[in-house]
Curated annotation (Swiss-Prot):
NCBIfam families the record matches: pheT_bact, YtpR
UniProt name for this protein: Phenylalanine--tRNA ligase beta subunit
Keyword Transmembrane helix: no
Keyword Metal-binding: yes
Gene Ontology CC annotations of this record: phenylalanine-tRNA ligase complex
Main location: cytoplasm
Chain ranges of the FDX-ACB domain: 694-786
Catalytic activity: tRNA(Phe) + L-phenylalanine + ATP = L-phenylalanyl-tRNA(Phe) + AMP + diphosphate + H(+)
Record note on cofactor: Binds 2 magnesium ions per tetramer.
Domain of life of the source: Bacteria
């Protein structure tokens, strides 16, 4: 939102410098992005009247002028502007003047003729281009000799505010003035809306066919206007200083009313309309040529203003070229409406262009402002373009209901930490236009139509706090007893997991929770993911149920940057639906390892990481839990190199190598290794229990079993561990042999058994029966002792 200080002062005139007002607005939540003067620095330029013009004797394109600059005598100036003529008043820079860019004016001779100054265009003064080829022509009543900065108010300060989406009421000079009045207690004097005299019987019928999308729609016919009338300089100046280019009087009036009171408007050429103006949803495939010279194909989620023949404008966004006013326009229809913000939001992105109107409508416009806007625009049209106004015609749809909100003074003190007198609170609320009513506990207000953001008590407390001034709330350091937070013995701290992963060489990454729907099919076989109603983009249309897709994408990015050894992990939530249909989110840790097992070095032979490398990382991560790895099938993983991670009979995650079919699809030179585990299980750990170290030597026995290839060694270990007693400290596989000496379809699995007693040295008499028992249960399971 951009505006000039001089315009603001017509509605609220605080006794503050521009710099102090900038600070005040910013501290109140209306951030001032930029403040600047209306024109760059220059001096020595005055209003002058051209008295005579003669051709230069030695130059066809130059003229010798005599100028009255208020010095008491005529000044001779040689000028090359094509529009110079006697009687006009123009800016004149006299000798000793300094123009923008430190350009100094001195007496000189031009083709032998003395010239004692320069007549100026807008460009030479650093002003916005007025579209004139030549000198900047001033009004006839401009006083000769007056400093041009003073006459054109060029020391006026321009404010650019960054208005937050909840404060659409501040997207007008009136809204800013209301805020300044509340902040400084100066008088708030908004423009007085005059009721226009009715001089025409013509009316423009209106109809709302989408009442949920349009709450109010008002029209007024004005006949016999002069569309070629010039926009007054005061209006041009205010528009230009608000960042809007002057186009024509009728268009400028609509823009001016929008900036002045906050209601976007549209002006139709009445003679180009056919029947009623109708607010409706567009028909799929309907087209509209817009004022920006773009033709758009409309979707049925778009609101349009139409007549009996078809769409005339994109409601709240942009008018159509077919019904636009031009220099030949004689009769116009003024239109003002209130549109539900939700129907306007996203349309700028959908159609590839926006406007000042859409910026306001999608944030919310005062739903009681439309009639005032029509009256104000009518007043300006009659004043500038003439004509005769007809009566307003109004149609209503569904309008918002005013909300009542209570404010407890006790709660106000608790939240802000300062005791603000009730009288001061009441004054602040009144200056904000909230019209408070006293209650036993404080005040009750009915949210005004221009404040969509006032919904709960906290909103009122915020208003009081920012107007009272956060800087006026004294510092009060929190005091109290400090107590260390207690972490249960059965739960490890989160940072320990991060440190563990970093120690293993993994780097933490963060990816979007919104993912490509295809990832869900590929990596989770999830054909019914949770869909987003308004996705950021097509490739972010669903919520993830696994972390694998994001990790693979990060791997691709690293490979594109020639990083051939990648180890990353992410701790984040995944999303799904429970058995009752409700959304469920669970936190998981996912990891990916790609490339060499070790960094390249002279002392270690280079090899790619395999399943057992990443399994070791998982075992280290879960070292405080008893876990098993059970062969499984998973849509993301290689069918022979995938395992579920099981703890206490419950699957808590999976680990394995990415399925070969995804390597080509995702352009990966080799298969990465991945894992994903429930974070709750990772943080869980058993209580640490003391156990004395045995003073007696352990005994090792190595057993080699011949077993069918189809038999899993985990099954063998499970049988052996089930038959073991307290003397057995460890049973594990240390070798697998296939080849000569074994029948076809058989393999030899070597198992080490570690035995140790806490009280005695083990003897063969104690060990051999147990070993025999282990051999027996293995034989029953289908594995015979290798001879």
């Amino acid at each position: 939102m951009q505006f000039s200080y001089s315009w603001l002062k017509t509605q609220a005139n605080p006794d503050l410098s521009a710099d102090k007002l900038e600070h005040l607005l910013t501290m109140a939540g209306l951030e001032v992005e930029e403040i600047d003067t209306a024109a760059p620095a220059f001096s020595g330029v005055v209003v002058a009247e051209v008295k005579s013009v003669e051709k230069h004797p030695d130059a066809d394109r130059l003229n010798v002028t005599q100028v009255d600059a208020g010095t008491g005598e005529l000044v001779q100036i040689v000028c090359g502007a094509p529009n110079v003529k006697p009687g006009i008043k123009v800016p004149c820079s006299l000798p000793v003047a300094v123009l923008p860019g430190n350009f100094k004016i001195k007496p000189t001779k031009m083709r032998g003729v003395p010239s004692n100054g320069m007549l100026c265009s807008t460009n030479e003064l650093g002003l916005p281009d007025d579209g004139v080829d030549g000198l900047h022509i001033l009004p006839e009543d401009a006083p000769v000799g007056t400093n041009i900065r003073e006459y054109l108010d060029l020391d006026d300060m321009l404010f650019t505010l960054k208005i937050t989406p909840n404060r659409a009421d501040c997207l007008s000079v009136k809204g800013i003035a209301r805020e300044v009045s509340a902040l400084t207690q100066c008088a708030f004097t908004p423009v007085e809306i005059q009721t226009a005299p009715i001089g025409s019987e013509k009316k423009q019928a209106v109809r709302i066919d989408a009442p949920a999308d349009c709450g109010r729609f008002i029209s007024r016919v004005i006949e016999n206007v002069n569309a070629k009338a010039a926009t007054p300089d005061w209006m041009k100046q205010r528009l230009e200083r608000s960042g809007i280019r002057s186009i024509s009087a009728l268009v400028d009036i609509g823009n001016y009313v929008m900036l002045e009171i906050g209601q976007p408007m549209h002006v139709f050429d009445a003679d180009k309309l056919s029947g009623s103006l109708i607010v409706r949803r567009a028909q799929n495939g309907e087209t509209l040529a817009c004022l920006n010279e773009k033709t758009v194909t409309l979707a049925d989620n778009t609101l349009v203003v139409a007549d009996e023949k078809g769409a005339l404008s994109l409601a709240g966004l942009m008018g159509g070229a077919a019904s636009a006013v031009s220099d030949g326009t004689q009769n116009i229809v003024l239109e003002a409406a209130w549109f539900e913000p939700e129907i306007i939001v996203g349309k700028s992105r959908q159609y590839g262009f926006g406007s000042d109107s859409s910026f306001r409508f999608e944030r919310g416009v005062d739903y009681r402002l439309q009639a005032d806007a029509i009256e104000r625009a009518t007043e300006l049209v009659l004043q500038i373009c003439g004509g005769a106004a007809g009566e307003m015609v109004e149609a209503q749809g569904k309008l918002p209901e005013a909300k009542q909100v209570g404010l407890r003074l006790g709660r106000l003190k608790t939240v802000l930490g300062v005791d603000i007198p009730a009288e001061q609170v009441e004054t602040i609320l009144q200056h904000l236009g909230l019209q408070p009513e006293k209650t036993a506990e404080g005040f009750r207000i009915t949210a005004p139509s221009f404040r969509f953001d006032i919904e709960i008590e906290a909103d009122l407390i915020e208003e009081i706090g920012r107007v009272y001034g956060y800087e006026n709330i004294p510092d009060d350091y929190t005091s109290g007893r400090l107590k260390m937070s207690e972490l249960p013995e059965t739960r490890r701290p989160r940072f320990a997991v991060y440190n563990e992963m970093a120690a293993r060489g993994y780097r933490e990454v963060i990816s979007y929770a919104f993912v490509d729907e295809q990832w869900e099919l590929d990596f989770a076989a999830n054909a019914a993911p949770i869909r987003l109603q308004n996705p950021l983009a097509a490739q972010y249309a669903v919520m993830r149920s696994t972390l694998i897709g994001g990790l693979v994408e990060i791997l691709q990015n690293n490979l594109n940057r020639k990083q051939n050894r990648v180890r990353v992990f992410e701790i984040a939530c995944v999303f799904g639906k429970g058995s009752d249909g409700r959304f469920v989110q669970n936190e998981r840790i996912g990891g990916l390892w790609y490339g060499a097992a070790m960094p390249e070095q002279w002392g270690e032979k280079t090899r790619n990481a395999d399943f057992y490398d990443i399994k070791a990382d998982v075992e280290n991560l879960l070292k405080n839990k008893a876990v098993e790895f059970v062969k499984t099938g998973h849509p993301a993983l290689h069918p022979g190199r995938a395992a579920n991670i099981v703890s206490d009979g419950k699957v808590i995650g999976f680990v394995g190598e990415l399925h070969p079919k995804w390597l080509q699809k995702y352009d990966l030179p080799q298969a990465p290794l991945v894992f994903e585990i429930d974070m709750a299980a990772v943080l869980e750990c058993g209580k640490t229990r003391y156990r004395a170290v045995s003073k007696f030597q352990p005994v090792r026995r190595d057993l080699a079993f011949v077993m069918p290839e189809v038999m899993n060694h985990d099954d063998l270990l499970l049988v052996l561990k089930g038959a073991a007693n307290k003397l057995v400290q460890e049973i594990s596989v240390f070798d697998v042999y296939r080849g000569t000496g074994l029948p076809e379809g058989m393999k030899s699995v070597a198992v080490k058994v570690i035995l140790q007693d806490m009280e005695n040295t083990l003897t063969d008499e104690a060990v051999e029966p147990l070993i025999g028992k282990l051999i027996g249960v293995a034989t029953e399971a289908g594995a015979r002792l290798r001879s």
